Structures are given as structure tokens and as C-alpha cells.
Amino acid sequence: MSMSWTRKGRIFDPAAHDWARSHAQVPTPLLYDDKVRIFYADRFEDGRSYTTFVDLDRKDLGKVIYEHKAPILGFGAPGTFDDDGVMPSFALRRDGQVWLYYSGWNRGVTVPYRNSVGIAVSDDDGTTFRRLYEGPVLERCPEEPYIAVTPTILRERDPDGRDLWRMWYISGLRWTLVEGKYEPVYVIKYCHSADGVTWARPNHLCIPQSHDNEAFSHPTVVRHRGQYLMWYCCRDSADYRDGAGAYRIGFASSPDGLDWTRQDDVLGLDVSGEGWESTMTSYPSVIEIDGRVVMFYNGNGFGRTGFGYAILEDQRD
């Protein structure tokens, strides 16, 4: 298999807007008739992430037509799983509502933070949100004791015709000490649900690490030409903050969404020689828009330089 992506450039740079803060991290698309809404995470001065959005012209994805200048969801109550940060991950429509699966953040003591998955619901087509529950729908568990976060979801049918929600998410393996600081190591796992809320977790590893300190983040999965295609980002546990071990976008394919063949070398979308994506490519989100396969993604600094997009021009099996 080979792929040919055309970079279309940066869409949104938070540094160019006086109301924005420091980041436009984890671009998360939702389609409308005439626009594409991109939820993303900015950060307050104290480093806590919050979620807001911009709207893009559906016919010209490089054109921002609306900028939302406030958080769409506040922090959780003290002691809850998201009292220190709210970061988008996947948006979908359900029963006249918009559901936003998001990553909640707690600051840690022995390690820097803990992450879990929550659901926020919008009754006004994706402008304001409320929590479906005060607690997480995906959390640490006996077999996965560290992190469960950044889901992507496909809604399908099981062999009996019943609803089947399929999720790919990040699961922590451990925290490893690097130059006196604990860094998280995590992989991509799979779970499923009948209702999108309660998840059966078979502890199924999707992609083995290439080395013990490799960490994955933000899988995005689509069905295309009879296959499941997954993009993600991966990094080392050392020197990964825009250094030699920084995030790069990777790729894998699967016949069933469970067992994956890693094919990073066919992706055809590495860092550029200079500019906003010169040291890092990260947090891909792939979606089909009007017959085109489009990837929204971050560049340097985990979204500090904003987000852009690329279009898949050719895929050969």
C-alpha cells in the first residue's frame, strides 16, 4: 500500500488571535451542511486545557468563518476526573444531540497527571455542552491501571443487526523515569459497547510497540474501500518535546478493526523542512468530506503552532 497526501497548509494559528491563548490542540471535526466545526483545546495561563471551536467553510476548508471565543464546557467539580482540564477527542450526532467524547485531566502527585474519558452533550447543535455524567465512562481499571483516554469511535451493527459502538483508545502501560521526570508510556487498545456509554474492555492491544519506550496517542479510524484504516501519532519517551523523539503521525490497516498491520512507511506525511510542522506532526483526525479523505492535525509544540490539514490524493493497495 502507498499513500499520497497533499498538504494544504495551516488553518488556524492561536498566536495570530489576541483572544486565543497558547494552543489549538487535538482538532476534532464535526460536519454540518455548509461548514465543518473543529473543536480544539486551548490552554489558560496556568496550563489547564479547555475546549472551544472554530467553523470552517465546507467548500474551502482553509477558510475560518467563525471563531468561538469562550470555553464550551467548564471544569469538573473539585475531585472529579476533569477538574483540571477538558480536551476534545471525538464528536458525533445521536438522537438530535451532539455528543462530544473528551479527555478529562487531574493533576497528580507522584506522576504529573491522570486521564479518563467523559461525554459532554449539546442540545443546540454543538454550541454549548453539559456533562452526560459527572464521572468518566472510560477510566483506569484492574487490567489497565494507568490511563484510558483519547477515544475514536465507529458506529456499526453486530451480526444480529444490533447497535455496535467500536472504540479505539489510549491505554497506559506505565510511567517511566526519564532524566528525573516521570513520562507516560501508552498504547492503542480496543473496546466495544451497545449504547456508547458502558464499554466492554477485552484488553485487546491493537499495535505492538517498536521499542519499550514508544508511546502512541490519538488514534483515528475510518472504513475505506472495505478496510479499516487507522492513523495515530507515536513518540519516544525521551526528547519528545519538539526534539528527536517528537511525535510523528503513523498508519495501520486492518480487515476487522481488531488486528492491525503497522505501515508507517507508506504514510507519506512527515514533518516539513521548516515552519509550523517542522519538528512534530501529531493528533491526526481523519474524516471523509464530500468524497475526499481529509486529515486535520497539529504540528510543533503539541498544538502550540495551531492546526492544518491535508487531503489524500491517492491510495494504492
Where in the sequence are the language-model features?
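Conserved active-site neighborhood of enzyme catalytic/cofactor-binding cores
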Residues: S285
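Beta-rich carbohydrate-recognition and catalytic domains
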Residues: M1-D84, L92-T150, L154-E214, R223-E277, ...
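Alpha-helical scaffolding within the catalytic cores
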Residues: S217-H218
